[in-house]
Amino acid sequence: QWQVDQTAFALASRYYWAKVNRLAEHPEAIAQPGPDAAERTDTRQFEEAPAAGRRMVVMTSDLFRAQQTAHAFADILGLPVTCDQRLRERSFGEWEGMTRAEIKAVAADDYASWKQHTGGETKHGVESRAAVGQRGADAVRALVIDSAYSDSTPTTLMLVTHGSWITATISNLLELDPDGMNALGGMRNACWCRLKVRHSVNGTPTEQPLWELEEYNKAPAIADSADWENGPTDLRGPHMPSWQPIVW
């Protein structure tokens, strides 16, 4: 939770304009003094701000841990959160919930194939990297052209999802081989990426949206000065497990 909250604070600061936009659209949510007060908050302060002309949409996987993360961010800014099954994590089939040691113990050859990106995990019902990347990219492309968000209002889509989904989806959008060993690295917990979408080149419309990866696997500044994986010592109790590096 510590990681999630630190990321939420950092991104809420970056996207504070979204709170102003929300209050401009819903002035009834602006706190007002009692009826006997000499003055009341002028809602035009929000309605006339440039931020009122923008839009932030927060969507999350319907899995619980993603919803927690989404609300940690959105609740600070007073934004609604919409669940979308298309943002669900990669399915790990028979291996769901197992540790790497447990998988290796029962399927050593297929575990090795998984490490080498040669697909042995799919024998156990695990969704392939290509499949999850296609599923995710289809969802992102559909959201970008959704009539609810594709009008002239500048819109930021905040998609809260899972590490394997993120890496595979971005790989697909950038036309990278998700099974290639020269690829995007795995996501750290509670980190973010930022994509910019373009619909034209030099004024000429493109058939499909074009994507620019502006940030990948980014964390708040505190991640560089604290134990990001385990949290500060004053937050750790004797029954909290310690994070262990993943050894492939």
List the predicted regions and their residue ranges.
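Internal catalytic-core helix/loop-beta-alpha segment
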Residues: T122-S147
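Active-site-proximal alpha-helix that buttresses catalytic centers in soluble enzyme cores
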Residues: Q1-L79
